Every structure is written in structure tokens, then in C-alpha cells.
């Protein structure tokens, strides 16, 4: 470390990605709280438990997709730094295709084995009544996985090239303007209740993910 010299420019470049990335995590937490609040309004705390358990399982299924996105971030950064835009485009396309295949497989497995998976999260006598509800929710949210590769690739490619603000904007549009607004519209305004909120989350995810994908394609 005796050769280390501080560089204000490098610190600024790091913070351009680090701060928006941190804000994205806060937004995702805010999304969860907003959905939970709406579920309490239209239903009961049981609906919150079902949603929480279902999304926890979906989050586990997203781990491979996050791994692919992290790899994309690294490759995209190297390609952008080397001015190799063709490699940037290729890595972006391949990550989406690979992620889509994985999400389709995981989504199908989740749909087929939803009752068995739900049982793992409601095995006690006190929570046994939640099993069919969690299984039903899983069969709805498995469609959520299909759109994840598009949105996550768009966000991570922007992070890879140092444009953290663009990645943050994608998250804001997807989580706040699409998922929360549509969940509120379908669940509360139109009166579809719990199912309306679930549908709003999925449709909002689709809209937000396609926006992120399209913006990243235009940028590349």
C-alpha cells in the first residue's frame, strides 16, 4: 500500500455506481412494504404471509439469474472499457437468452411442484392451512420469473459501463411506477383484491423489464 495514491476521479466513478445501487436495494424494500400494506387493506395478514413466503421462494429461484447478471456486469465493463461494443452487445444478448432458458425451466418446475415447495414453508400445524394458498401464489408468481432476465440484464449492463443512475431509473420505473401503481389499480381501485395485487406486480414487472431491456438495447 506504500505505492497507493488517492484518486478523486476513481472514487467518483465508484460512487456513481455504488450510490444508485444502494438506492435500488432501498426501493426494493419499499416495494415490499407497499405491497404488504395493500394486501392488509384488501385482505388479511394471511395474504401478507402468503406473499412473503411466495416471493422468498421466487427470490431463491432468481439466484442463478443474479449470477448470470453479475457475470454480465463484469464482461460489459471490460468490453465497454476496451471500446469493444460488439462484445458488449453479444454478452448482453447471450445473458438474456441463457437467463430466459433458466427462468423457463425454474418457472415450470415451480408450477409443477408448487404444492411440495409450499409444504416446506408451512409444515407446522399452525401454518398448515397456508399450504394451498402458497402453492396457488407460486403458480402465479412463476410467471414473474420469465421477465426477470430482461430487466436485470438491462440494469446490470448499465452498472457495468458506469451508468448507475440509468440502472436506478429502470428500478424506479419498474418497482414504483409500474408494479406499485398497477397493484394499487387492480387490487384497490378496480376491486380485484389480493389477485389484483398479484396481477399488478407481474404485469408491472413485465412492463418495467421490457423498458429496461429496450433502453439497454438502444444504448448498446
Segments and roles (model prediction):
Residues 3-34, 39, 60, 64, ...:
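Hydrophobic faces of transmembrane alpha-helices in multi-pass small-molecule transporters and flippases
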Residues 1-18, 76-144, 187-220:
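Short alpha-helical transmembrane segments in multi-pass integral membrane proteins
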Residues 66-69, 141-160, 166-175, 182, ...:
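Short runs within selected transmembrane alpha-helices of multi-pass transporters and secretion channels
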Residues 24, 28, 32, 58, ...:
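Alpha-helical transmembrane segments of multipass membrane proteins
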Residues 29-54, 60, 78-79, 118-125, ...:
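Helix-terminus/linker motif at the lipid-water interface of multi-pass membrane proteins
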Residues 50-114, 148-170:
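Small-residue-rich hydrophobic transmembrane alpha-helices
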Residues 46-47, 164-166, 193-194:
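Membrane-helix interface segments
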Residues 21, 25, 33, 37, ...:
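Transmembrane alpha-helix boundary and packing residues in multipass membrane permease domains
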Amino acid at each position: 500500500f506504500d505505492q497507493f495514491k488517492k484518486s478523486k476521479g476513481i472514487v467518483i466513478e465508484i460512487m456513481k455506481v455504488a450510490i444508485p445501487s444502494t438506492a435500488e436495494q432501498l426501493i426494493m424494500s419499499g416495494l415490499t412494504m407497499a405491497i404488504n400494506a395493500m394486501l392488509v387493506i384488501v385482505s388479511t395478514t394471511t395474504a401478507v404471509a402468503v406473499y412473503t413466503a411466495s416471493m422468498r421462494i421466487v427470490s431463491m429461484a432468481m439466484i442463478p439469474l443474479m449470477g448470470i447478471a453479475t457475470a454480465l456486469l463484469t464482461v460489459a465493463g471490460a468490453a465497454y472499457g476496451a471500446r469493444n461494443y460488439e462484445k458488449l452487445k453479444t454478452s448482453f444478448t447471450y445473458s438474456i437468452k441463457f437467463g430466459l432458458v433458466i427462468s423457463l425451466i425454474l418457472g415450470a418446475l415451480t408450477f409443477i411442484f408448487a404444492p411440495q415447495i409450499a409444504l416446506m414453508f408451512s409444515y407446522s400445524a399452525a401454518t398448515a392451512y397456508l399450504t394451498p394458498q402458497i402453492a396457488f401464489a407460486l403458480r402465479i408468481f412463476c410467471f414473474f420469473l420469465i421477465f426477470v432476465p430482461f430487466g436485470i440484464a438491462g440494469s446490470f449492463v448499465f452498472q457495468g459501463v458506469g451508468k448507475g443512475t440509468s440502472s436506478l431509473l429502470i428500478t424506479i420505473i419498474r418497482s414504483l411506477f409500474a408494479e406499485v401503481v398497477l397493484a394499487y389499480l387492480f387490487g384497490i381501485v378496480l376491486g380485484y383484491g389480493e389477485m389484483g395485487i398479484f396481477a399488478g406486480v407481474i404485469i408491472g414487472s413485465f412492463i418495467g423489464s421490457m423498458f429496461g431491456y429496450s433502453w439497454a438495447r438502444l444504448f448498446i
